[in-house]
Amino acid sequence: MRIERRFTKPGQSSYAEIEFRKAVSEIKNPDGSVVFRLADIDVPAQFSQVATDVLAQKYFRKAGVPKLLKKVEENDVPSFLWRSVADEKALKELPEAERYGSETDARQVFDRLAGTWAYWGWKGKYFSTEEDASAFKDELAYMLATQRVAPNSPQWFNTGLHWAYGIDGPGQGHFYVDPFTGKLTKSKSAYEHPQPHACFIQSVEDDLVNEGGIMDLWVREARLFKYGSGTGSNFSYLRGEGEKLSGGGKSSGLMSFLKIGDRAAGAIKSGGTTRRAAKMVVVDADHPDIEAYIDWKVNEEQKVAALVTGSKIVAKHLKAIMKACVNCEADNGDCFDPAKNPALKREIRAAKKDMVPENYVKRVIQFAEQGYKDIQFKTYDTDWDSEAYLTVSGQNSNNSVSLKDDFLRAVENDGNWNLTARKDGKVMKTLKARDLWEKISHAAWASADPGLHFNTTMNDWHTSPAEGPIRASNPCSEYMFLDDTACNLASLNLLQFKDAKTKRIDIADYEHAVRLWTVVLEVSVMMAQFPSRQIAERSYEYRTLGLGYANIGGLLMSSGIPYDSDEGRAIAGALTAIMTGVSYATSAEMAGELGPFPSFAPNRDNMLRVIRNHRRAAHGQSEGYEGLSVNPVALIHADCTDQDLVAHATAAWDKALELGEKHGYRNAQTTVIAPTGTIGLVMDCDTTGIEPDFALVKFKKLAGGGYFKIINRAVPESLRSLGYSESQIAEIEAYAVGHGNLNQAPAINPSTLKAKGFTDEKIEAVNAALKSAFDIKFVFNQWTLGADFLKGTLKVSDEQLSDMSFNLLDHLGFAKKDIEAANVHVCGAMTLEGAPFLKNEHLAVFDCANPCGKIGKRYLSVESHIRMMAAAQPFISGAISKTINMPNDATVEDCGAAYMLSWKLALKANALYRDGSKLSQPLNASLVEDEDDEDFVEELIQQPLAQQAVTITEKIVERVIERVSREREKLPNRRQGYTQKATVGGHKVYLRTGEFGDGRIGEIFIDMHKEGAAFRAMMNNFAIAISLGLQYGVPLEEYVEAFTFTKFEPAGMVQGNDAIKNATSILDYVFRELAVSYLGRHDLAHVDTSDFSNTALGKGIQEGKTNLLSTGWTRGYKPTLVSSNEGDRAASEPKGSATAAPARGSANVTSFAGSAARKLEPTVAITTSEIVSFKRDYEERAKELAEEIAEEVIDEVVQEAQQTATALFSDKAAADAASAKAEAKKKENERRMRSIAQGYTGNMCSECQNFTMVRNGTCEKCDTCGATSGCS
């Protein structure tokens, strides 16, 4: 073959026109600890810090690279392609520690790859002359260095280590077909023949232990996972549950073996590999176990939810039971007898109500009886890497169902569907096709699995059906071919082929790159070794390739073309058509020199039929396709604004067909669209694969650590192409990214701050900190301004300073809307919606996969993703790896509709991801807002005052399922309660309660005296309605359930309440407060004031004998012992009248039984702040409680309790540990939500622990360290 030079010149270095720079690569954990560091490395100047980090961390060889090398002469190889080995003699002159080391120059990596490909290409007779080989090597090195193209990760890891450095090792059980003899050979060297393939499809037979069977598959998968590759298999040959075995028994079924494979993959992943095992499981829709398979992940997610919730409920009750036993002072084992220990009896009842197993309750009591003081019961969370997810199955694979057209047509026609036995084809079960379709849609909605393979469409485009059908794919579903074959990937960065002057794709450069990289991937098949003999043989016979592209989203946005537009789809289709057409033409050209792939002859007619169908689609034909069940979406020439692309697309397919008819093809497949996760970062791609962009503001990594905000580089270029002036572009960018200072900000600026007492020095300090801030609230704090200034000038108290939720701007009197307006000005909106000068008709150009920023509303529709895939699919040999993002409020029906549209538009596969469908993913706040409650309040205000009480009562009555009619219960004329003052979203709220004689709540008053008359009247009538309901027996729990989490203004931060720190409305705040105080609902508090820890102070057997009281007025006070010299306490004295030093945040409180009918002797009156919710049985227990409360405690108990209290409170280790854990969790959640606002998924990277994960095909990748679960 003749190789043209387009980027380099003969006799000149590949890098002559490329500037390089010194760099330091460092990746840190969020806590600042260094994960990886490599200093003084050389990289191309255009490489970003992220690209530098990925190259240095993942692709530089870290050890075994000799400092001094020598060439190994080969007579039949040009000298510039001679391989190198360590110069042992020269190395002996160096200190031993300096003889071997790491690659430190990007040129070492580029030369290692390009040189190895040229070396094997020469040996395989791919080049006509030495100059062609030299041009091939130089052009490839140049394209790697300029980020035009990148191969998949295994090429970077393995290729060239033997050729460039002489690195070698014993064989690892791999095989290869000798390219010169055609004989299958077992590898003796680990590196001479590298493993460059990322994607594998493996067969599995219905055999337990023999080669090619079930257990053998786990071994073959393990070998692939160990080296970072992914694999997929169709398990439909395995018999269903209950099918007969040859030995006379019955099969345990498909699912039992899938769970074994899942465990094996998970163990390998956790055994030290750099990323999760990438695995695809496929099952045909007519398999007898298909229903269980579809529900597999749904059920496992439910198990996780049960583990997480159940573990916390059980732990709570078991600790309470243990505490009731330990804090008891009775004799003769009475503490462990619920009949004699009322506190224990109460806790057992509460545990039984929450379904805690009785044998575990008994076990804890026995444990306490043996002298133990505390119990450890492990709780779980929904983190992806937590033990809860590790405990359940099905978490280590992507699951897909393979559907044929007859099933989909049965769904359309509401027909029946048969599930058939694997051996004899007997019908095992018949069900409605729509029922199975509903199950698939629900599972995708609930757990993001399964994806779908449209099997008929896959096989209609199959180039080699003589050997059998396509049954499976790799984990990301872009490579679809015969079982036991492999594919190595490479992707072109489309944006790098855009001409800076013409603003169009340089088609000649693009076609040149496609041609050369088709040769690279073909040579890679020749030089490769494979993990099994079957894959080695079949890969040699079919020689499938995986050339693709990335950055179509970035290209379209930078060109001012919406992703969701006919023009955008036409350009994507034309570029895809050129790529595959030129690649097949190159394959035919190689076949003319070296012969077609060995299995071409029996598949000639089918392959040429497929090529003709590709050509018809490129020519824009809507009819005349051969052997297709569903016609593709043809290229619409008129929609493409660059007609040169159309001309080259049609010419490429004309040539591909012409040369193929003449020579055949060297490769059965040549192209796919892969996720391009890690390699996309190396190429600094804005978008991966065929994906749109995910954010308009990016966070660029700095060499010394940290990030700074920059506008997506496609935005200014797009605005220029749309005709905006430079000054307008600057304003639009500043709106998105922020101005970085308060100088011209609305409401909060130097003038208004000076009026509040700020000096020029303090304003300058604020402006300096704002340059890198994500939110202005994070800058107005004691670390920026100094504690002395805050306390002295701004009158901030020590308590406020220590409050993590304290908002200084709120304290200074700035309104929420003013803070938000200033925040947008300073830190940016992170969206272009609302930007100055930007026309509404241009907003679509900047639509992303998700809403951008806090105020962004626009995002690409589900249909836009599917139609973009459909525009490219007719020009791809394989398929497209892509996951369709769906909003959280998408329905099961929406999922089914998306899948049905995918089939009708002739896609080969698709997968869905509904936001929040995984427990491990936090919900995006913007997706869970509910305006219904705000609408309800607005409608309420419009009503007459008399009607308002009726409406509110009706809302409550809807919540009460059944209640026995009863008379109104009157409150005492002189009644107890408490007053709680707080500020909610800047508005003062006074909540007062009135209690029945036994401590139950009977009325509330809500006073917001500075609000308008209408709002005050509404709140007053609301409180009356609630009070009437309470007096007529409506349980407080029903009000709590109805009104917590309601959302309307005023809302926001809560100050002055020790348990509640944030509320979504006044009603939310009021009923959270009442729930915590009267129901013990500490799950509704933000600061847990309960006392379940082992340092909490109780009163033994008296624990359950004190009258039920509100804890609203006692919350936050230290335990107080009433000494005997304080005298008797009158029954009429109000609760809480004892002097107690306030200690905000303390979990232990004191309450007094002050309403007894007679005076009590001085007692230890120490109880927990927990109040048991008696719900509807409190009347039955009133007499029992009245009798219990009259019992006395002797003086010895007073002294002993005083000693116990002193001892318990002297050790704060447990409390400190709990506080630290809570604070760490709070910070993690803050970082998680901040990452969501920045456009990331909110999940944490398992390698570097940063919250910088973005969706990448069916998986995710980390923008910080490049970790990915995909194949690239």
UniProtKB/Swiss-Prot annotation:
The keyword Nucleotide-binding applies. Its EC number is 1.17.4.1. SUPFAM superfamilies: PFL-like glycyl radical enzymes, YebC-like. It catalyses: a 2'-deoxyribonucleoside 5'-diphosphate + [thioredoxin]-disulfide + H2O = a ribonucleoside 5'-diphosphate + [thioredoxin]-dithiol. Disulfide bonds join 199-487. Keywords: Cobalamin, Cobalt, Disulfide bond, DNA synthesis, Nucleotide-binding, Oxidoreductase. Coiled coil: none annotated. Substrate binds at residues 153, 198-199, 230, 474-478, 675-679. 5'-deoxyadenosylcobalamine (coenzyme B12). Transmembrane segments: none annotated. The active site is at residues 474, 476, 478. InterPro entries: RdRp_reductase_class-2, RNR_2_N, RNR_lg_C, RNR_NrdJ/NrdZ, TSCPD_dom, YebC-like. Pfam families: Ribonuc_red_2_N, Ribonuc_red_lgC, TSCPD. Belongs to the ribonucleoside diphosphate reductase class-2 family. Catalyzes the reduction of ribonucleotides to deoxyribonucleotides. May function to provide a pool of deoxyribonucleotide precursors for DNA repair during oxygen limitation and/or for immediate growth after restoration of oxygen. This is Vitamin B12-dependent ribonucleotide reductase.
